[in-house]
Amino acid sequence: MGSTKRMVKVSFTKMAGTGNDFIMVNNVKKLYNLDWQAFAVRFCPLKTGIGADGVIVLDEDTDTDFTFRIFNADGSEAEMCGNGARCAAFFAVQQGFAKNSMRFKTLAGIIGARIDKEDVAIQMTDPEGLEPGISIDVEDKRMSVHFINTGVPHAILFIDHIEDARVFELGRAIRFHNRFAPAGTNANFVQVLSQDRIHVRTYERGVEAETYACGTGAVASAIIAEHLGKVIGAPVHVRTKGGDLKIDFTRDGSRYSGVWLIGPVDTVFTGEVMVRS
């Protein structure tokens, strides 16, 4: 006779960081031994699950406050997620295993975070791979995009009227373009609003759709805009569909460090789901 899988009750909190929503699971005491990729595919859909851009699992770590893992709605595990990391920091304080200032481990490196009243700020890993002015052919047209990795890869396209951006169609074409194979890239559409403010819409790899916000995309867009002289210095204020973010950083030539992503986090609801283990 084959083994029978047992049902496990998983407690979760749904949180949102500027419109990016996540299913948060506290696993620092190793309560759950689950296939988190399958969990994300099962519960991220809105109509048949909880509804979220991804699942964030916080595991125990001996060197930092915890380990951060994020699984996209398609089940793929991402290296990092800016707004997800901000939610994780807030969630860790709520759950009582981190203080208002903390460090945690991600696949992209160690992240610092602090809780400042209504805002959660995370110190990102230093961006890499800055490459402005990449020419690619999309839909039989030549366009110039700019690339940077802010924990995950991002391509940036500046446009004059962001309301008219074909985020899904063009974003998907850029995301899967051979130039960025095999890992692919996120695609950001950016309109400059003033010398310290931009508006960003993002097609997210793994979600495979436009999201209300993308923290690493906001950081990537702000740094590229500053690098090209489209905004002046830091901080850069970023408008997204889900709300406003602030990006701070230090520049030394073409190197950027001390990068902070700052914005609000909301707890939406808590609940439990039954999962076969």
Give the residues covered by each predicted segment.
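Active-site glycine-rich loop that binds ribose-phosphate moieties when present
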Residues: D126-V145, R172
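Internal active-site segments that recognize and position negatively charged phosphoryl groups
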Residues: D137-R166
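A glycine-rich beta-to-alpha transition motif near the start of alpha/beta enzyme domains, typified by
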Residues: G2-K117, I156-S277
